[in-house]
Amino acid sequence: MYPAHLLVLLAVCVSLLGAASIPARPLNLYQFGNMIQCANHGRRPTWHYMDYGCYCGKGGSGTPVDELDRCCQTHDDCYGEAEKLPACNYMMSGPYYNTYSYECNDGELTCKDNNDECKAFICNCDRTAAICFARTPYNDANWNINTKTSC
């Protein structure tokens, strides 16, 4: 083998090792964000819901601070139920990694019939949460709170 070929092979191996250490990201987070934007007609950016109260964002504990935070708690619970479904219980098929089919028409969200059992369940979790977000007041004081003292 030529030295140049060895260098290319080494570079590819190093790149693959680096890629293996990148944490997996939820694939349907983008879809959920689009559902939120559909339901609220783009009035509030999706990232405003990523660090709100005790349940909106990563994790969740304690008592929800308001109705919007309860929407997030319900969404977390819904994902927990999805993880118990046999159809959602195989590698990369759970609520955070499974994508689904849906439609948005003038703020109305519809989960499509071509979703399998797991995708349909997850889609309905996201749809219900997005509708809840759209109808519930947003309190700026509950964004980026100290969850250790407030939850």
Curated annotation (Swiss-Prot):
Record-annotated disulphide pairs: C38-C104, C54-C151, C56-C72, C71-C132, C78-C125, C88-C118, C111-C123
Recorded GO MF terms: calcium ion binding; calcium-dependent phospholipase A2 activity; phospholipid binding; signaling receptor binding; toxin activity
EC number: 3.1.1.4
Active-site feature positions: H75, D126
Residues making up the signal peptide according to the UniProt record: 1-27
Top EC class for this record: hydrolase
Key words, A-Z: Calcium, Disulfide bond, Hydrolase, Lipid degradation, Lipid metabolism, Metal-binding, Secreted, Signal, Toxin
Tissues and organs where the protein is expressed, per its UniProt entry: Expressed by the venom gland.
Alphabetized Gene3D superfamilies for the sequence: Phospholipase A2 domain
SUPFAM superfamilies: Phospholipase A2, PLA2 (SSF48619)
Pfam families on file: Phospholip_A2_1 (PF00068)
Cited InterPro entries: PLipase_A2, PLipase_A2_Asp_AS, PLipase_A2_dom, PLipase_A2_dom_sf, PLipase_A2_His_AS
Catalytic activity: a 1,2-diacyl-sn-glycero-3-phosphocholine + H2O = a 1-acyl-sn-glycero-3-phosphocholine + a fatty acid + H(+)
Family (UniProt): Belongs to the phospholipase A2 family. Group I subfamily. D49 sub-subfamily.
Described purpose of this protein according to its UniProt entry: PLA2 catalyzes the calcium-dependent hydrolysis of the 2-acyl groups in 3-sn-phosphoglycerides.
Protein name as annotated: Acidic phospholipase A2 5
